[in-house]
Structure formats: C-alpha cells, structure tokens
C-alpha cells in the first residue's frame, strides 16, 4: 500500500513536541495513503497518544508539519480537520443522554440530515440500546457509538486511540470487522495499540514508536511472513533438529521457523530427502508479541 498509486491522506514531517525540558516527540515522519490501515505501536508513554493529538489539533507541535488531504494543519486547520474523524476517549459521551440523542447532536453540529443519522445508527448496531442512557452501556457499546459518531461526516481519515482497551473477545472481533468495513468504504485509519497482535489481519503497516521516536516501519504481510512458525508431527523429531537449523522443540512439540516461503520449501525438501515422514504440518498463529518484546527490550 502507498507509493505513487495512492493518494496521500496524511503526511507527518519532522514533528516534535516538547514541554519544558521534556521532548515527548522527536522528529516523527510518516505518511498514510488512501484505503490504508496503519497501526501505531509502542508501550505506554512512547508518544502514541501525543502524535495523535497533534494530528487532530488537540496539541500544538513544537516543530514540523502535518498535512491532511493536502491541507496544512497549521495554516488551514479548518479544512484539514474537516477530513478527519476522531475516536479517542469515552469521556466525550454524555452519560445521561442516549445513543440516539448523541447522533442527533452530532448531525446538527455537522449539518447532516436524518438519513445519515439512520445509516450510522444502523452501523453502530446498538439496537434497543440506542434509546438508553450511555451510562448503562457496556465498553463494547460505547466503542461502537464513539466509532459511529466519528464516521458521521464520512471522513477521509479516522484516528482511533487504543480501540480494544477493556473489550471482551467478541467485542474485539466485532470492532475489527467494523474497521475493515470503514476502510473498504474509502476511509483510511490510524489506530494505536501497545499490542502488536491486535493489528494481525487488520493493519497494512505498523509504525513502531519508542521514547518519542519512530524506530521502525514494517509492512504487516512481510512481518507475518518473515516470522512464520510451523508445527510438525514427524517420524523422528530429534533427527530433524540435526537436519534443520531453523527447527526447535518446545513442550515436546517440534516447530520450524522460516524467514521466507523459499526457506520453508527448502526445509521440506531436506526432510523428504532424508526420509523423514511428515504426518501433519500446520502454520501456527504468528507470534507477533515475541517480535514486539525483542524490539522494545532494554
């Protein structure tokens, strides 16, 4: 994703943020393109929320430039901010008001018609909860409401901060599907998380932030492929350990780690040539968190 084939929705150039003598962000630069989901990854205090607040205009950057749909945030903030939707904090909800009342307030503020209210109420999937006060909502319901409100004006870019916090597995699954729907309908997404595995099968790219600096950028497909792990049931596991340097045994089960499809094919050929019978082989869910821990250790 990206390159010259896609429109640049967001461009962050050399952005720094300093409060007194503390440099919270240090020369951050990246771009987000049309129909792309990008994850901002890092531990608590890395600077994820700060860069998001700079992009949404909640914080003023000390240095750098931010462009949203070709509008300069500093010199033309009104037009720049019209192109983004923000889903950052639940406190933006009024606890005594219902979901339906929130949609009406947002529609009035954005000058939207009743048809758009109906569309986004349906998208929120709140059902009977639409007419209950939000103080009685579950975390999942609050997240769906905040997300739908952020999408009311069909923004080109959605900013969403740690969306899975406090959600149960079903709510996370539902949220992931909604984010993919949003992307497929033409909105790019920048979301933050401190868990790399949350981006699996969702994001196109991951931006890794540590101590206010962008330390690495990775394509998610490449990241998964380069760390593929396979579980094998074979006739002679100990012999495989001698044949393949990329194999290991964990809890009495044989695994093989491959950095490419070519290495995977070569490894299988070695087993066949040495008369090792492979009874079963399965790709294990990518251990992205191990990669994350290795990147941030020390």
Residue ranges and their predicted role:
Residues 1-16, 298:
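ABC-family P-loop ATPase nucleotide-binding domain
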Residues 5, 82, 122, 184, ...:
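Alpha-helix boundary recognition
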Residues 10, 17-191, 196-197, 201-204:
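ABC transporter nucleotide-binding domains
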Residues 61, 73, 77, 220, ...:
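Residues at or immediately preceding the N-termini of alpha-helices
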Residues 76, 223, 291, 295:
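Residues that scaffold the ATP/ADP-binding catalytic core of kinase and kinase-like folds
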Residues 99, 220, 285-288:
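Structural motif detector for alpha-helix initiation sites
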Residues 176-258:
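ABC transporter nucleotide-binding domain
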Residues 229-298:
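Short, charged/small-residue-rich alpha-helical element at the C-terminal edge
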């Amino acid at each position: 994703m990206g390159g010259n084939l896609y429109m640049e929705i967001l461009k962050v150039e050399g952005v720094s943020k300093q409060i007194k003598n503390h440099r919270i962000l240090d020369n951050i630069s990246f771009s987000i393109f049309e129909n792309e989901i990008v994850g901002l990854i890092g531990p608590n205090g890395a600077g994820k929320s700060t860069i998001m607040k700079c992009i949404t205009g909640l914080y003023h950057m000390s240095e750098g430039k931010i462009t949203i749909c070709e509008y300069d945030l500093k010199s033309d903030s009104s037009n720049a901010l019209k192109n983004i939707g923000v889903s950052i904090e639940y406190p933006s909800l009024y606890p005594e008001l219902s979901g339906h009342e929130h949609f009406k307030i947002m529609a009035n503020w954005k000058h939207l018609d009743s048809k758009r209210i109906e569309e986004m109420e349906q998208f929120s999937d709140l059902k009977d909860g639409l007419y209950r006060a939000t103080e009685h909502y579950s975390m999942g319901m609050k997240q769906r409401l905040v997300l739908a409100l952020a999408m009311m004006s069909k923004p080109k870019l959605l900013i969403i901060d740690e969306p899975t916090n406090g959600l149960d597995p079903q709510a996370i699954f539902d949220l992931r599907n909604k984010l993919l729907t949003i992307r497929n309908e033409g909105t790019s997404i920048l979301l933050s998380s401190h868990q790399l595995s949350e981006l699996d099968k969702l994001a196109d790219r991951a931006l890794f932030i540590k101590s206010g600096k962008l330390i690495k950028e990775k394509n998610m497909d490449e990241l998964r492929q380069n760390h593929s792990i396979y579980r094998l049931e074979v006739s002679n596991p100990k012999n495989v350990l001698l044949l393949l340097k990329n194999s290991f045994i964990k809890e009495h089960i044989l695994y093989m780690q491959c950095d490419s499809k070519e290495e995977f094919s070569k490894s299988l050929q070695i087993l066949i040539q040495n008369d090792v019978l492979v009874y079963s082989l399965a790709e294990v869910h990518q251990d992205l968190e191990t990669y994350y821990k290795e990147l941030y250790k020390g």
